[in-house]
Amino acid sequence: MTDDQFFLESESERCSQEDSLFHILPVPYEKTVSYGTGTAGGPAAIIASSQQLEAFDGISLPLESGIYTHKAVDCSGNDTEVLAEIEKKTASIFAMGKIPVILGGEHTVSYAPIMAAKKHFDVVGVVHFDAHADLRDELDGSKLSHACVMRRVHEDRKSTRLNSSH
């Protein structure tokens, strides 16, 4: 993927931020993986493979609502800085009345957009599909590990409903 490639480029013209309901935010984050590497390549691979998709899914044309692809988040900083940047960018998408679509990286990526949603909405529901619950308090000395992300999300039970399937 190049910096100027966008989601479903093969099926549409580039949409403006203002005219797009859906905002793709690529987050090539890979800091706490414990088994294999490669999660940082996920967003680029998804965007590149989207060129093989058809815009019509048999029911609707999501492109009619507009899809805007942001430049990938710079994930070279420390965990706290990167997550703050992801949360800030997600919050700005919510503030525009748009729907963020976050393409990650490892599971830790989920934390920041969920925090942005919790600040924007009264109650947030999270449906978590994974082979693991990701509810550890910490892993390898990090409370922001991919294995801890759902625990961090669920700590504020007043505003988060978490359903997990693993």
List the model feature ranges, each with a label.
Residues 2-164:
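Conserved alpha-helical scaffold segments that buttress catalytic/binding sites
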